[in-house]
């Protein structure tokens, strides 16, 4: 999006990196013809940026970048956009996947400050390992009531405020746009430190299968798929 895209443009190495912000969810390509797809500003911009053209005139030798990195938020919306993009690449740019040119960025989920040290955690398990199981998130600290006056046995609110006296803070990143350019570079864009996952044909086939099941016209199959996987779903409500 524009927020993370703006930070990314400020953070990038201009000699080797280009950033293409995608606003919102891209077009549902399940039923879209090539001409309708190219009427979408986002897909048209992506095709131009890649340089390969699309459809019958696709030419991988004209590919302008050898690492195409999908960077989305670590939430349900981000996963949806990532699935849309993987499906687009699988159906219309498959040689890019076969050639090992498509990657998924792995931004951190948490920023942990311990005194003057800064650590980044990419999972809940890593957060617990660095900060400890009981370390409160900043959002939890901000929502706490002020310490009540008086003496005696601490109340639950007082007990929760003990964390304020410890030089430890844990911030959860809900999206790439929450990072400033320096953080985005350090964690997600610096070739020396970033973590990338190479997209394989199997990954793209899985994304395409799920996309086809959920966005296609076979309603009974979609209902059956949703019912069988309902317990595995992660929902933002």
Predicted regions and their residues:
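Conserved phosphate-chemistry cores used by DNA topoisomerases
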Residues: 2-237
């Amino acid at each position: 999006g524009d927020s993370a895209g703006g930070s990314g443009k400020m953070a990038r190495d201009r000699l080797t990196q280009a950033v293409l912000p995608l606003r919102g969810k891209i077009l549902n390509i399940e039923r879209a013809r090539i001409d309708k797809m190219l009427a979408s500003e986002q897909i048209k911009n992506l095709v131009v940026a890649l340089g390969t053209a699309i459809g019958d005139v696709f030419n991988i030798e004209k590919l302008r970048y050898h690492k195409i990195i999908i960077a989305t938020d670590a939430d349900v919306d981000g996963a949806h956009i990532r699935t849309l993009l993987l499906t687009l690449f699988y159906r219309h740019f498959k040689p890019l996947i076969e050639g090992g040119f498509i990657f998924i960025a792995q931004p951190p989920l948490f920023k942990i400050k311990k005194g003057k040290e800064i650590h980044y955690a990419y999972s809940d398990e890593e957060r617990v390992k660095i900060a400890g199981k009981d370390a409160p998130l900043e959002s939890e600290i901000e929502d706490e009531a002020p310490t009540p006056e008086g003496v005696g046995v601490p109340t639950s609110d007082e007990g929760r405020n003990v964390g304020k006296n410890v030089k430890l803070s844990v911030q959860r990143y809900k999206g790439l746009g929450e990072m400033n350019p320096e953080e985005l570079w350090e964690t997600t864009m610096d070739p020396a430190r970033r973590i990338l996952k190479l997209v394989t044909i199997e990954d793209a086939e899985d994304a395409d299968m799920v996309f086809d099941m959920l966005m296609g016209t076979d309603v009974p199959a979609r209902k059956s798929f949703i019912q069988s996987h309902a317990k595995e779903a992660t929902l933002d409500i």
